[in-house]
A protein has these predicted regions:
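Sequence/structural segment immediately N-terminal to covalent heme-attachment motifs in c-type
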Residues: 17-33
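Detector for the c-type heme attachment site
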Residues: 28-37, 57, 117, 424
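Extracytoplasmic electron-transfer domains, predominantly the class I c-type cytochrome c fold
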Residues: 29, 38-85
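Blade/loop signatures of beta-propeller domains
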Residues: 96-141, 296
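Repeat-blade elements of multi-bladed beta-propeller folds
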Residues: 109-116, 148-169, 187-213, 234-267, ...
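Short loop/turn segments that connect beta-strands within beta-propeller blades
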Residues: 174-177, 217-220, 279-282, 353-355, ...
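Surface-exposed loop and turn segments in beta-propeller and other repeat-based domains
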Residues: 228-233, 286-310, 358-389, 434-439, ...
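Beta-propeller blade signature
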Residues: 271-284, 344-357, 472-484, 591-600
């Protein structure tokens, strides 16, 4: 605290103008360019000073900030984190529960124990009273404000307890009134959902941004053990949520080297996506699997004279699925980061749960090599791979289900706008169906849902920095399991002309990018424009809607606003639905609200 006060004095008395100059010289050219779809400087005022320092020292901006001294980084982080200076985010208090969590609290109602609800990633809650007839009676019961500008991590709910992440803290709240049972502070930022330990039902696992794995006592929040997953490079990140089957905690590995590649001095690219398996009892690392073989030099760039490397990329952005019976893991991968593109990018991969060995890999798009340098004029000719995209990776979790004959199948949606059904044993594509135009931020982005008869697909189709062959088709789509035929579609109307971010300068966009969820005959979907809605699974018609682009009074006293709904999907338990609002990445509308709804 004394150091922060000193820095505030330093900035205000000695170098406010210099701080502004540092930001202008080092940050503004990219973060004030609307065409790059990056978080705006004004939206960064929702970040804390410690979060900004993490980004500059260890995160996505480490390469770009490498020429700055530690003092300059601290000045920039304090200057940008105006909320800590001006008090915009002050006033939070600890609304503590009057008692601790009891074992009965964990078992007396239904749960949503992981990112995809179950290990098949169905995102379908079978134990809820919400249906098409009563969903219109949903009311907002409470809201919780976090200290960041993105509500990125999806909550999970275990009985009467909801677990939600806030920067480097995990909060255990009462799901009916939002009071706090306990709070656990991690060593680094929390980007993803925790997962319930299915063996004892009384502990949870979470993974921070530095690949520190924690096992916590769910009743008390006390640490049981911590473990560290070895990674090849600091640019590897655990973006997607972990999943569990028995003694195996499966942790997906991604990479933000796509951002580092915008620096022509960077030796692009060496990182790879991967999977790690951690023993749920001891925390020991059972195995790790790198998707790509070790990168090899391709020689030096003709202009930069910097060495280039491949293969690289194939990040795992989605929570894997697990077939416990056949001891298999399944997941999708991202694009390659350097040409030549590999055979494992933009692919669905099946892997042995016990050994971590690949069983099969089905690539749906060849030649997709792309990094963020491809979007920056003046730099892209130096750093963009020869194949130049189109960046159509798999961001959404792969779903396992069964066809009419009772045979296991896999269902996958891609940013290209294509949806695929695959044979679970061979990876052979049974059918594919085009539901969206696709794009860097388009097509199917974060997650689908199913009732084991039809597949329900959200489409973003947000246009970004390139021309497209067809008009965008943002909306919801229902596909038949057997042939992939589109049964119905709900097109999302564009209302962005009348909408403006409540914090920062993020832009409104039209589309369903966040994962969707369902229960009974109702589908819940959050939109990039901030609307949260319920739709009939029979025909897609809208049954209920709540506009989250507003200010909220929160149970923890933290001022909160809603914004774009992206990434994390709705969580449904009994008569309750929980949703995050606020996502400033890609130049979208910042926000910091977690909202709790229930039936009257």
């Amino acid at each position: 605290m004394k150091r922060i006060l000193f820095l505030l004095f330093f900035v205000s008395q000695l170098a406010f103008a210099d701080a502004s100059k540092l930001v202008k010289e080092n940050c503004a050219s990219c973060h004030e360019d609307e065409g790059l779809n990056l978080i705006s400087l004004s939206s960064m005022t929702y970040l804390t000073q410690s979060e900004l320092m993490y980004v500059l020292q260890k995160g996505k901006m480490k390469q770009q900030a490498s020429h700055l001294s530690i003092e300059e980084k601290e000045v920039i982080s304090v200057y940008l984190a105006q909320n800590e200076v001006s008090g915009n985010m002050t006033g939070s208090f600890n609304y503590k529960c009057t008692r601790s969590i009891g074992k009965r609290d964990l078992k007396q109602s239904s749960s949503w124990p992981s990112w995809g609800y179950d290990n098949f990633n169905s995102r379908n809650q079978p134990n809820s009273n919400i249906n098409a007839d009563n969903v219109k009676s949903l009311k907002l019961r409470w809201s919780f404000g976090i200290s960041s500008q993105d509500v990125r991590a999806q909550p999970i709910v275990i009985g009467e307890v909801i677990l939600l992440s806030d920067s480097d803290s995990l909060h255990a709240l009462n799901r009916k009134n939002g009071c706090t049972y306990w709070k656990f502070t991690s060593k680094a930022r929390l980007r993803n959902a925790p997962v319930l330990n299915e063996i004892d039902g009384e502990s949870i696992f979470l993974v921070d941004s530095d690949f520190e794995v924690y096992k916590l006592n769910l009743l008390s929040g006390e640490l049981i053990w911590t473990s560290k997953i070895p990674i090849d490079y600091e640019s590897n990140i655990p973006s997607a949520s972990p999943v569990q089957s028995g003694k195996y905690l499966i942790v997906p590995i991604s990479t933000f080297e796509t951002v580092l590649a915008i620096d022509p001095r960077h030796e692009c690219c060496k990182t790879s996506g991967g999977i790690a398996a951690v023993d749920t009892d001891s925390g020991e690392i059972i195995w790790t699997h790198r998707i790509e073989e070790k990168s090899k030099t391709l020689g030096k760039g003709l202009i930069t004279r910097i060495e280039k490397f491949a293969p690289a990329g194939s990040a795992v952005w989605n929570a894997p699925g697990i077939d416990r019976e056949d001891k298999r893991i399944f997941f999708g991968t991202g694009q390659s980061l350097q040409s030549p593109a590999s055979n494992y990018s933009d692919a669905i991969i099946s892997m042995n749960l016990e050994s971590g060995e690949k069983i099969w890999a089905t690539q749906t798009l060849k030649g997709d090599a792309y990094n963020m340098g491809c979007e920056i004029p003046g730099i892209k000719r130096l750093v963009c791979p020869e194949e130049k995209g189109p960046d159509f990776d798999f961001g959404a979790s792969v779903i396992q289900s069964k066809n009419q004959e009772g045979e296991k199948i896999l269902l996958a949606g891609q940013k290209s706008g294509w949806v695929f059904r695959l044979d679970i044993n061979t990876g052979e594509i049974s059918w594919k169906s085009k539901v969206g135009n696709g794009g860097t931020l388009g097509g199917v982005h974060f997650g689908m849902t199913t009732d084991n008869k039809n597949l329900y697909v959200p489409v973003s189709d947000r246009k970004v920095n390139r021309d497209y062959d067809n008009d965008a088709k943002p909306g919801l789509y229902a596909l038949d399991f057997e042939g992939g035929d589109i049964l119905w579609e709900y097109r999302l109307d564009d209302i962005c002309e009348s909408r403006k971010a409540l914090h920062g300068e993020g832009k409104c966009s039209t589309g369903f990018s966040a994962a969707i969820s369902m229960t009974n005959n109702v589908i819940f979907a959050g939109a990039l424009d901030g609307r949260f809605s319920a739709h009939a699974s029979e025909d897609g018609s809208k049954l209920w809607e709540f506009d989250t682009l507003r200010d909220f009074m929160t149970v923890n006293g933290m001022p909160a606003v809603g914004g774009s709904i992206d990434s994390a999907g709705p969580v449904i338990v009994d008569d309750w639905v929980f949703v995050n609002s606020g996502y400033s990445q890609h130049g979208q509308m910042a926000g910091n609200a977690i909202l709790a709804f229930s039936l009257d």
